[in-house]
Design a protein with these regions (language model features):
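Phosphate-ester processing/binding pockets and catalytic centers
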Residues: 1-217
Length: 217
């Protein structure tokens, strides 16, 4: 049996008052990647027949009525488990601004929450998917951060893969994009409607610096 983990982030890496307040890292866990695929494909073609040149779903760019349809499909799923960490950037130690240090830090928190609920050693294989990262330095740092933290939860001989694929190539990368965006707009804009559609799927929603008062800017 395979455990699938799809990752997505929301927010930017501008660690200054002009950047986004939060960075959100979200993990979608499932054992079955077939449910919702047909429904999303069918809905995509319904959108196209309405005159939209839609190649794939992307929450920040899709029209509201398209988002409503996608959230309806995701919300009807009962095989998904969502784990998410929220990092208020002003409270993050500047030593962690570099992506080579940030990703291990963020993954450590996300995986601690995720694997407190899931038990990866009971699976034959763990496959992690995330969207392509075009910048080589950031891509390498991300892969290293995932690998370093993931291996601590696996048996020594257990198989795992970490794959970076374009989100347009995999429906579940588009689903986790929507999930992460829903959490992000809840925290940044107090916009709860998207989050309300998927709240029943969320197992953990962890604000990393909830108990910290220190700010760096």
């Amino acid at each position: 049996m395979i455990l699938y983990l799809f990752l997505d982030e929301s927010g930017n890496f501008d660690f200054s008052p002009t950047g986004t307040r939060y960075l959100v890292l979200t993990g979608l866990v499932t054992r079955d990647v077939m449910p919702a695929v047909v429904a999303l494909h069918r809905f995509k073609h319904e959108v196209i027949t309405q005159g939209e040149n839609l190649e794939y779903f992307h929450a920040t760019e899709d029209r509201q009525w398209v988002r409503d349809g996608v959230f309806g499909i995701i919300g009807a799923c009962d095989h998904l488990a969502v784990h998410t960490v929220i990092i208020e950037k002003a409270r993050l130690d500047p030593a962690l601004y570099d992506t080579r240090r940030f990703y291990p830090f963020a993954c450590r928190h996300l995986f601690a929450d995720t694997f407190a609920h899931e038990h990866p050693t009971s699976f034959d294989r763990v496959i992690v998917f995330m969207d392509n990262i075009p910048v080589r330095r950031v891509r390498r740092a991300t892969l290293k951060g995932i690998k370093e933290n993931l291996k601590g939860y696996l048996a020594p001989s257990q198989h795992y893969d970490i794959l970076m694929h374009a989100s347009k190539s995999h429906p579940y990368l588009q689903i986790v994009d929507y999930l992460s965006w829903a959490v992000y707009v809840k925290w940044t804009r107090a916009e709860r409607r998207p989050w309300n559609n998927i709240a029943h799927l969320i197992r953990t929603e962890h604000e990393v610096f909830e108990d910290s008062e220190r700010r760096y800017y």
